[in-house]
Design a protein with these regions (language model features):
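Conserved alpha-helical positions within TPR/SEL1-like repeat arrays
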Residues: 17-25, 48-59, 82-93, 116-127, ...
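Short, glycine-/aromatic-enriched active-site segment of Class I SAM-dependent methyltransferases
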Residues: 376-396
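A short acidic, Gly/Pro-enriched loop at the edge of an enzyme's catalytic core
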Residues: 336-345
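Class I SAM-dependent methyltransferase SAM/SAH-binding core
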Residues: 284, 288-334
Length: 450
């Protein structure tokens, strides 16, 4: 019996696009890109291929190309609600919030039952200072999809910011019911209990979490924060990485709702020092995050290096296109290994994850050249007497002004400290310290051990 011949056939264009979408969902982006390219060579006006090729470009950080492709797809198929919502996502990531809001509203006009568009609209309404409209948008998303975890989480965050803490806690409880091991919701619920003075309930959440995941850095750190027991001298690397990797995508949108001022306060302290762009300095942005501070100090820099522990944050910093290099490293190790490398070190809202500052300050002193400047922000431990530092229930450290002055002076630096409000949190201003310290020509050598 003769073996049967296998038969092959070429995929239709629709089948090819569906195959590319499957590759895209499986994170095989290069392979998907190759399929979209071939489809669009054969049919340049194929709406689905244009749209999903645009989404792929967005996934790969090419937002300009992404928007061009998505706009072409919508010109060909203007009544696609999903596509309008996706356009909003790309615009939002590009910082074009008003245009993104319009795109989400257009998606809802086409399909009033589009729960994700309602939720995404709520995020931007909150970010642009419209909490009443944001709440309505989140509740619309929940009404359409009673298991919409993101909408419940976002509504809880909004309500907490409006000091409606008990309502916020109810939202987080719902999220945990839907997804029992969702880290962010567990943390938010525990913080809500802390706000309500229910520290025992907060501790129970973290203790149960640790019983299930004994090595989880977030649960361990936050248990210490809400109980005051076994407080570490600084947040563990794992805590910082896990916190900011999960937070990176929404980081700037959230800060936009908090009147966040730390980078601007750092820049003002540089202007106060008389720095001018003509000086062309070698600058370290220590804990660069998504690059908010880097964008402000770039005019002073001949060379700007950003260092952070979070790959997610570094990816967003790369989009700012202001850094000469971005490095994933622990700050103390990096600065300590780069003697006399920088004229200026800035650190906005990063040293709040250090309690004991002696080691990191010693590393910064080594990394600074003579007459170099160190500028950073801290949260101010107001009303705690002459405390060195305190781990607060939200997981960040606050520091005493006297402690900071003594530490910098003993390190041979000349400090100037200004008190300022860093941002709003739960409806109240967060008191801060903006610190500038100059390294003299012959600074006192300091070791991390003191």
């Amino acid at each position: 019996m003769e073996p049967s011949e296998s038969t092959t056939r070429e995929l239709t264009l629709e089948e090819a696009v569906s195959f590319a979408i499957l590759l895209q969902k499986n994170e095989q982006l290069d392979e998907a890109h190759a399929v979209y390219r071939r489809v669009l060579e054969a049919a340049p006006d194929h709406p689905r291929a244009l749209h999903y090729a645009g989404l792929l470009a967005h996934q790969q950080g090419r937002n300009g190309e992404a928007l061009a492709l998505i706009e072409r797809s919508l010109a060909l198929a203007p009544d696609q609600a999903d596509w309008c919502s996706n356009r909003g996502v790309v615009l939002q990531s590009d910082g074009r919030l008003d245009a993104a809001i319009e795109s989400y509203r257009r998606a809802i006009a086409i399909d009033p039952g589009h729960a994700n568009a309602h939720n995404n609209l709520g995020v931007l309404l909150r970010a642009t200072g419209r909490p009443v409209e944001a709440e309505a948008a989140y509740r619309a998303a929940i009404g359409l999809n009673p298991e919409h975890i993101d909408a419940y989480t976002n509504l809880g965050i909004l309500l907490n910011g409006l000091q409606r803490t008990e309502e916020a806690a109810a939202c987080y409880c719902k999220v945990i019911t839907l997804r029992p091991k969702y880290r962010e919701a567990r943390k938010l619920l525990a913080l809500a209990h802390c706000t309500l003075g229910e520290f025992g309930k907060a501790a129970e959440i973290f203790e149960q979490w640790l019983a299930e995941e004994p090595d989880d850095p977030i649960a361990r750190h936050m248990l210490a924060a809400c109980t005051g027991r076994n407080v570490p001298a600084r947040a563990a690397n794992g805590f910082v990485q896990a916190t900011f990797d999960s937070f990176a995508a929404s980081f700037e949108a959230k800060l936009a709702t908090l009147s966040y001022r730390a980078p601007a306060l750092v820049a003002a302290m540089l202007e106060d020092a008389g720095l001018a762009p003509s000086q062309r300095l070698d600058v370290l942005d220590a804990g660069c995050g998504t690059g908010l501070c880097g964008a402000l100090v770039a005019p002073f820099a001949r060379r700007l290096i950003g260092v952070d522990l979070s790959d997610g944050m570094l990816a967003h910093a790369r989009d700012k296109a202001v850094y000469h290099a971005l490095i994933r490293a622990e700050l103390t190790e990096y600065a300590g290994a780069n003697n006399d490398a920088f004229d200026l070190i800035v650190s906005a809202d990063t040293l709040v994850y250090f309690g004991e500052l002696k080691g990191i300050v010693a590393a910064f002193v080594r990394a600074l050249r003579p007459r170099g400047l160190l500028v950073f922000t801290l949260e101010h431990a107001v009303g705690n007497g002459d405390v060195d530092y305190r781990l607060q229930p939200h997981g960040r450290y606050s520091h005493g002004r006297g402690y900071v002055e003594r530490l910098l002076t003993s390190a041979g630096l000349r400090p100037k400290i200004v008190e300022a409000e860093l941002r709003m949190e739960a409806g109240a201003p967060v008191p801060g310290l903006v610190v500038r310290a100059e390294k003299p020509v012959s600074a006192k050598p300091v070791s991390a051990l003191g």
